[in-house]
């Protein structure tokens, strides 16, 4: 402690400038006799400090220090002994032969001194390996149910850490853990519930029972109730058919006497997917009550949660606007920022200017993290009130010019880009602000992002030539990465603006003298395309880019080179396509408001190597497309099966991911048998699962050849076949060698047209449409009886055909009774497929009709695709 004013003035962090060598030298004092407890405590604290600061200590040095620490066991000083336990835990990872202190720790763990026992348990579990764990198992069981709460908690928390090393041993302590959950001590009950959940985490049915049991038997600990709410929330999210009683339990916690539990329950309810406004209203009311709490932390948590909810349910949060208005002048800037941004998301259009003026007054005083919250609120606001972009855009531009982190600048740039893409009236102003930004941008990733946007959007503005100066400045002044992106942007101007093409060619010729070969190569390539003025080449190689899988392209080229036959040129059509061009940045959702999450098709690359390694499928060639995971069983079934369809040029491989949830069974020779009632589809090679133990996931495969009739859709029956061997649930060892055969009926396997089509967007749909000609054009008109409005019809036709919308044509303006969507993709084999679908609502009976035109460079492909909707 500081005893006088002088100590206070010279005080500071005594550990600030520690030298590792000096500390290890001082550690030799541990060998002195008699032991100076005060001095050794100070040295140990230094040693622990440098380890926790990430200082690297060699194993020899650490082992020498560790052996010195072990000699301190001779001291009876309580403070020194507790420091010894901490030092043992820290040195355990970097020292050799730490096992020598096992007997000393075990003695302290089972001794009468309660002050030592808890710390000894933590240290012992830190150094114990899987082989030694069984020797202390009896002591751990006793410690878990010990009457001393500190000892019980330390044993339970140590067991949670041991779950990572030897989960099977810890699972045997379930009875003791269950008893500890009944403890009167709040922390013991909380820790015991956490361990009990981890023990049962792999058994969904057991987790559901755990929630049901403790939701009825009121837990005393508010910490445990909060943890139970989190478990219940996960059950609701994971289950396909959630139990209503679980939701009722969470809702009942809104009336708990603990403020912490009330907030946790409210946060859980509003974070659940697919909740209705009536379901979240009680949670909103609870959060509104938390806003009046005298504790700043509770107010902050409530306002932050309301801020997140306002994005998805702005109308539900409007009832809190009066309370949120009071927080605008809150001295805590974090609370004030969250309150204002929430009001921006929920308030009326007339209040926007007033709120923006208030937040402009202190936006420079808050951290970048909260500035990003402000930016997100502006993004949401521009979606609700598009006309307010005249107020928002200058504010964003001012924020963009201020100092800030990369994430902060990225959030602003993404918001401006989203506004430009959503609101045509804001395009010119937004592009002007971004041009000004890249004049003095220190982040290459953001510069290339903006240059890509300029190349795509600026040629469509009334005065495209005004942007060329900003782009060419990047060629002169920036890094190689940015210069290359600028060259590509210039080429896109030349491709789309014929009157500017001669000027662009002059600029590209200057780029031929660049010091970097990437820039020179791009300039040479684009100059050749523009000079020849072949619109087909310009469309395919400048505007759309090469839309293939990078790893698939590499693998196909290697296969071509290894074949040794170069009489025919390399065919790009054998390369798997991708929705994103190689030259474009990662696909980003540009919408101003968050969309509902959709299951995404897995990337082809992880499966390509796996399938190529299976001899039966190695000759099929590259994977064209992989589907999303499709459930063929209920999630709570004894055996769960998910299917992934992998489409090749002339065949389809069905991958069945099987999981055994029965802990008393070992499944052998697991396979999926397919049967086509029409007799068109035939199963080829199959790969079965030899062994499927409890809790593990393995894959079986079946090959389907596309029928000679040309059919590309159908439904097949599926049956899971396997042999069952009974095993001991605890050890997993077989009870005997006897097996018996069993079957399990799965959901039907559907093969659709969309499985043979990969959606690939065209940046210039009109040029691509004209380039295909009219030789392979098919047209149909029909009624849509299963959809209720135009947006649903657009979404449905895109899913059925497997095509993706182009030029943001899937966004239907509100109130329109007729809309045309442009769709594009590639059919397996590399054949382009384009579609124009016009959807109209009959004003008399509100029925929906659709006229669809399909174009392809192969007539048979056009026939197959149109058959999917007829």
From Swiss-Prot:
Location (main, coarse): cytoplasm
Pfam family, one: COP-gamma_platf
GO cellular component, as recorded: COPI vesicle coat; endoplasmic reticulum; endoplasmic reticulum-Golgi intermediate compartment; Golgi membrane
InterPro entries: ARM-like, ARM-type_fold, Clathrin/coatomer_adapt-like_N, Clathrin_app_Ig-like_sf, Coatomer/calthrin_app_sub_C, Coatomer_g_Cpla, Coatomer_gsu, Coatomer_gsu_app_Ig-like_dom
One Gene Ontology molecular-function label: structural molecule activity
Compartments, record wording: Cytoplasm; Golgi apparatus membrane; Cytoplasmic vesicle, COPI-coated vesicle membrane
Segments annotated as HEAT repeats: 60-97, 99-133, 168-205, 278-315, 316-350, 389-425
Name listed for the protein in its UniProt record: Probable coatomer subunit gamma
Lineage: Eukaryota, Metazoa, Ecdysozoa, Nematoda, Chromadorea
């Amino acid at each position: 402690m500081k005893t006088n004013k002088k100590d206070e003035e010279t005080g500071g962090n005594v550990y600030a400038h520690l030298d590792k060598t000096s500390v290890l030298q001082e550690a030799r004092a541990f060998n002195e006799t008699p032991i100076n407890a005060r001095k050794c405590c100070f040295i140990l604290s230094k040693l622990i400090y440098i380890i926790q600061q990430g200082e690297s200590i060699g194993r020899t040095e650490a082992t020498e220090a560790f052996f010195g620490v072990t000699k301190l066991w001779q001291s009876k000083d309580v403070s020194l002994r507790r420091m010894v336990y901490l030092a043992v835990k820290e040195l355990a990872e970097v020292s050799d032969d730490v096992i020598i202190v096992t007997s000393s720790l075990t003695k302290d763990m089972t001794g009468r001194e309660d002050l030592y026992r808890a710390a000894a348990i933590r240290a012992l579990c830190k150094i114990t390996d899987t082989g030694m764990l069984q020797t202390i198992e009896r002591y751990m069981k006793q410690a878990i149910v010990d009457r001393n709460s500190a000892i019980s908690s330390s044993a339970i928390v140590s067991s949670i850490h041991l779950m990572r090393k030897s989960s099977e041993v810890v699972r045997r302590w379930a009875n003791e853990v269950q008893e500890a959950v009944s403890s009167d001590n709040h922390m013991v009950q909380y820790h015991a519930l956490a361990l009990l959940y981890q023990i049962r985490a792999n058994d969904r049915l057991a987790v559901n029972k755990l929630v049901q049991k403790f939701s009825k038997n009121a837990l005393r600990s508010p910490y445990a109730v909060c943890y139970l709410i989190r478990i219940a929330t996960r059950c609701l999210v994971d289950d396909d058919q959630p139990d209503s009683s679980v939701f009722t339990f969470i809702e009942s916690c809104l009336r708990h006497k603990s403020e912490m539990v009330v907030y946790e329950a409210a946060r859980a309810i509003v974070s659940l997917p697919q909740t209705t406004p009536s379901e979240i209203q009680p949670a909103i009311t609870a959060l509104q009550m938390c806003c009046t709490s005298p504790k700043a932390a509770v107010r902050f948590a409530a306002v932050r949660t309301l801020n997140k909810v306002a994005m998805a349910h702005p109308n539900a949060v409007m009832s809190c606007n009066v309370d949120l208005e009071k927080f605008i002048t809150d001295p805590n800037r974090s609370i004030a920022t969250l309150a204002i941004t929430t009001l921006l998301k929920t308030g009326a259009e007339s209040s926007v200017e007033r709120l923006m003026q208030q937040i402009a007054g202190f936006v420079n005083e808050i951290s970048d993290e909260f500035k990003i919250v402000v930016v997100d609120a502006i993004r949401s606001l521009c979606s609700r009130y598009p006309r307010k972009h005249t107020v928002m855009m200058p504010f964003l531009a001012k924020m963009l010019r201020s100092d800030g982190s990369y994430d902060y600048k990225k959030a602003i740039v993404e918001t401006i880009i989203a506004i430009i893409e959503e609101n045509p009236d804001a395009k010119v102003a937004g592009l002007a602000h971004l041009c000004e930004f890249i004049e003095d941008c220190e982040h290459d990733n953001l510069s290339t992002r903006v240059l890509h946007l300029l190349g795509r959007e600026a040629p469509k503005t009334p005065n495209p030539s005004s942007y060329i100066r900003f782009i060419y400045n990047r060629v002169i002044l920036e890094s190689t990465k940015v210069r290359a992106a600028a060259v590509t942007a210039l080429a896109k101007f030349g491709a789309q603006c014929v009157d500017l093409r001669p000027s662009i060619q002059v600029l590209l010729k200057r780029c031929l003298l660049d010091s970097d070969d990437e820039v020179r190569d791009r300039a040479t390539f684009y100059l050749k395309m523009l000079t020849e003025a072949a619109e087909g080449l310009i469309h395919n190689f400048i505007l759309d880019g090469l839309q293939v899988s990078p790893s698939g392209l590499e693998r196909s080229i290697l296969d071509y080179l290894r074949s040794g036959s170069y009489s025919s040129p390399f065919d790009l059509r054998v390369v798997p396509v991708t929705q994103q061009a190689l030259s474009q940045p990662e696909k980003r959702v540009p919408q101003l408001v968050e969309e509902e999450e959709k299951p995404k098709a897995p990337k082809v690359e992880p499966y390509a190597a796996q399938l190529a390694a299976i001899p039966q499928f190695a000759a099929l060639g590259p994977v064209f497309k992989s589907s999303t995971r499709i459930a063929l069983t209920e999630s709570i079934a004894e055996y769960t099966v998910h299917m992934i369809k992998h489409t090749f040029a002339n065949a389809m491989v069905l991958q069945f991911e099987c999981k055994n949830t029965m802990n008393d069974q070992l499944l052998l020779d697991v396979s999926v048998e397919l049967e086509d009632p029409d007799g068109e589809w035939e199963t080829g090679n199959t790969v079965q699962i030899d062994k499927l133990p409890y809790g593990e996931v393995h894959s079986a495969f079946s090959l389907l050849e596309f029928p000679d009739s040309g059919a590309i859709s159908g439904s097949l029956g599926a049956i899971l076949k396997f042999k069952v061997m009974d095993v001991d649930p605890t050890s997993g060892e077989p009870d005997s060698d006897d097996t018996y055969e069993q079957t399990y009926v799965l959901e039907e396997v559907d093969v659709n047209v969309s499985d043979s089509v990969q959606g690939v967007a065209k940046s210039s749909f009109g040029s691509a449409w004209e380039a295909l000609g009219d030789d392979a054009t098919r047209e149909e008109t029909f009624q849509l009886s299963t959809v209720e409005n135009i947006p649903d019809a657009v979404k449905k036709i895109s899913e059925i055909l497997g095509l993706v919308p182009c030029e943001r044509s899937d966004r239907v303006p509100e109130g329109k009774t007729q809309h045309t969507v442009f769709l594009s993709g590639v059919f397996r084999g590399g054949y382009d497929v384009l579609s124009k679908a016009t959807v109209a609502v009959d004003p008399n009976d509100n029925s929906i009709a659709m006229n669809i035109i399909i174009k392809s460079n192969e007539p048979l492909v056009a026939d197959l695709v149109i058959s999917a909707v007829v």
